[in-house]
From Swiss-Prot:
This is Light-independent protochlorophyllide reductase iron-sulfur ATP-binding protein. It comes from Cereibacter sphaeroides (strain ATCC 17025 / ATH 2.4.3). GO terms for biological process: light-independent bacteriochlorophyll biosynthetic process; photosynthesis, dark reaction. Binds 1 [4Fe-4S] cluster per dimer. Its EC number is 1.3.7.7. It catalyses: chlorophyllide a + oxidized 2[4Fe-4S]-[ferredoxin] + 2 ADP + 2 phosphate = protochlorophyllide a + reduced 2[4Fe-4S]-[ferredoxin] + 2 ATP + 2 H2O. Pathway: Porphyrin-containing compound metabolism; bacteriochlorophyll biosynthesis (light-independent).
Length: 297
């Protein structure tokens, strides 16, 4: 599109980015689909895995899809690093018809089904392609037919077209943040990206999870200013750190008081997401406004 163009052509979404339209046959139907975003290292995989476990405790059939080349999204559910879709495709010279479900889908805690999409080497390819191929494989093998909940755990705070690919499938996006400036700044960018995509996709913002935070005052100030909402608060508990070291979800840990507190919050979050949330119309804040709101005096 030329800089002189004054209108965005039909078929594009957000800031002039080209929208890749999904084939109808590749759409996920019959399940509630959530995409989990947040600043790199904020605890998205911990949040996603414990949320998947919580949904399973509520009796839901859950599939978690890790969308990070590190392929560690599901290791607390499975207890190991499982092969990625991109790796098993390489093994068959990218002939997906030669793959069996057991080659790339692994059962984890309480029956949660786990898939690691993986990704191309750094600086090459597009992560969005890998996500698309993963969903196609799942559809071809009818692995989504009996699923109630699908959770995409998405790489870092990347909001390019590639790693926005899960938004094409998601009903709602959940943002993981912390009670600090950098995390909230990243959340603001993610809100802008999701809102742009929601012009043409069904995805809507569900809200944020304040993770590894003793307090939530900064998160709450931002939410008030942006008409966003906080869905849950996961305190900075050593039990959560230990669960990662033990390769377990909180629901597989011994029942000490901190573990029970965190479990209860995840179960409450899962139930609220399942029941559905009132619609909202959040807006991202200009950079200067965030600095004035949360920056140092």
């Amino acid at each position: 599109m030329s800089p002189k163009d004054l209108t965005i052509p039909t078929g594009e979404d957000g800031e002039g980015s080209v929208q890749v339209h999904l084939d109808e046959s590749d759409k996920i139907t019959g399940a509630k689909v959530f995409a989990v975003y947040g600043k790199g290292g904020i605890g998205k995989s911990t949040t996603s895995s414990n949320l998947s476990a919580a949904f399973s405790i509520l009796g839901k059939r859950v599939l978690q899809i890790g969308c990070d080349p590190k392929h560690d999204s599901t290791f607390t559910l499975t207890g190991s690093l499982v092969p990625t879709v991109i790796d098993v495709l390489k093994d068959v010279d990218f002939h997906p018809e030669e793959l069996r479900p057991e080659d790339f889908v692994f059962e984890g805690f309480n029956g949660v089904m786990c898939v690691e999409a993986g990704g191309p080497p750094a600086g090459t390819g597009c992560g969005g392609y890998v996500v698309g191929q993963t969903v196609k494989l799942l559809k071809q093998h009818h692995l989504l037919d009996d699923t109630d909940v699908v959770i995409f755990d998405v790489l870092g705070d990347v909001v390019c077209g590639g790693f926005a690919a899960p938004l094409q499938h998601a009903d709602q996006a959940v943002v993981v943040t912390a009670n600090d400036f950098d995390s909230i700044y990243a959340m603001n960018r993610i809100i802008a990206a999701v809102q742009a995509k929601s012009k043409n996709y069904k995805v809507r913002l569900a809200g944020c999870v304040a993770n590894r935070s003793r307090a939530t005052d900064e998160v709450d100030r931002f939410c008030e200013a942006s008409d966003f909402r906080r869905l849950a608060h996961m305190p900075d508990l050593d039990a959560i750190r230990r669960s990662r070291l033990k390769k377990k979800t909180l629901f597989a840990m011994d029942e000490d008081p901190d573990v029970l507190v965190a479990r209860a919050e995840y179960l409450r979050l899962a139930q609220s997401l399942w029941d559905g949330l009132p619609p909202m119309s959040p807006h991202s804040l200009p950079d200067r406004e965030i600095f004035e709101l949360l920056g140092f005096d």
